[in-house]
Amino acid sequence: MKLIRGIHNLSQAPQEGCVLTIGNFDGVHRGHRALLQGLQEEGRKRNLPVMVMLFEPQPLELFATDKAPARLTRLREKLRYLAECGVDYVLCVRFDRRFAALTAQNFISDLLVKHLRVKFLAVGDDFRFGAGREGDFLLLQKAGMEYGFDITSTQTFCEGGVRISSTAVRQALADDNLALAESLLGHPFAISGRVVHGDELGRTIGFPTANVPLRRQVSPVKGVYAVEVLGLGEKPLPGVANIGTRPTVAGIRQQLEVHLLDVAMDLYGRHIQVVLRKKIRNEQRFASLDELKAQIARDELTAREFFGLTKPA
């Protein structure tokens, strides 16, 4: 899969044109995968590559930060999942005020037609685009007739009466229903990132942790979990993780802290994927570090029981 970073690199787009879909693809859940499977069929019929157009940041994150939903996937993981789905190209557009000011007509004639040479387009029938959200599905249908590309609206993917959507995944996570979230996603929910130096508080109380900052992201989950850590060897490593602000030590920024069970290694600079397996408890504030230490010991015991591990002598 080829990643095209920004509209200034559109010369890297396929010269023969493409079949295209546009969206956030947050989580790359089973509904997204069904859409991409259909897009691949259209690509095969036309002998054209499949392209996904994404926006970074997502539009709501620019215009209404307080209303923007928690992200299920960072860009790096999103790209990995899209590659697994057989996508040929991803155009990652920097969504800023300048791009947002692009008229709907220019979005169609300049971006879709002139540079991407789109031959087939799949978007939701509620898709809006262009300055002031002036462009809609009806305008795209008219443009398709004028410029010679086919357009279809993406159907909501349902199973057993359950709508599969990023919103439904977030709700399952908010309800601590990891099994439902995994069923909707088609893969376990995980948080990924690079391990950075922390204040080493965990080390001083006997529970060294790998710290992964969540940056500007709002996490869809909070609390303490039994986890499996990928990216440190052939097998997943069991651990216990806290996702939150660490209120006991007056923390402010959200971060992910992982304590590996029975493994000691230097993780600084390593990129890890932390798969949530079981919710142990909500994050809470303790009156002292001794209370915190005692609770972490109980959390570790709960995680060990979940993984069927005995405590080393």
Curated annotation (Swiss-Prot):
Q: Does the keyword Flavoprotein apply?
A: yes
Q: Which GO terms describe its biological process?
A: FAD biosynthetic process; FMN biosynthetic process; riboflavin biosynthetic process; riboflavin metabolic process
The chemistry this enzyme catalyses reads:
riboflavin + ATP = FMN + ADP + H(+); FMN + ATP + H(+) = FAD + diphosphate
Tell me where on the tree of life, at the top rank, the source sits: Bacteria
> Does this entry carry the keyword Metal-binding?
no
Which pathway is recorded for this entry? Cofactor biosynthesis; FAD biosynthesis; FAD from FMN: step 1/1; Cofactor biosynthesis; FMN biosynthesis; FMN from riboflavin (ATP route): step 1/1
Annotated Gene Ontology MF terms? Answer: ATP binding; FMN adenylyltransferase activity; riboflavin kinase activity
Keywords, A to Z, come to: ATP-binding, FAD, Flavoprotein, FMN, Kinase, Multifunctional enzyme, Nucleotide-binding, Nucleotidyltransferase, Transferase
Write down the EC number. Answer: 2.7.1.26, 2.7.7.2
Identify the InterPro entries for this entry: FAD_synthase, Riboflavin_kinase, Riboflavin_kinase_bac, Riboflavin_kinase_bac/euk, Riboflavin_kinase_dom_sf, Rossmann-like_a/b/a_fold
Its annotated function is as follows:
Catalyzes the phosphorylation of riboflavin to FMN followed by the adenylation of FMN to FAD.
Q: Which PANTHER family match?
A: RIBOFLAVIN KINASE (PTHR22749:SF6), RIBOFLAVIN KINASE/FMN ADENYLYLTRANSFERASE (PTHR22749)
- Identify its protein family: Belongs to the RibF family.
Q: What is this protein called?
A: Bifunctional riboflavin kinase/FMN adenylyltransferase
**Gene name for this UniProt entry:** ribF
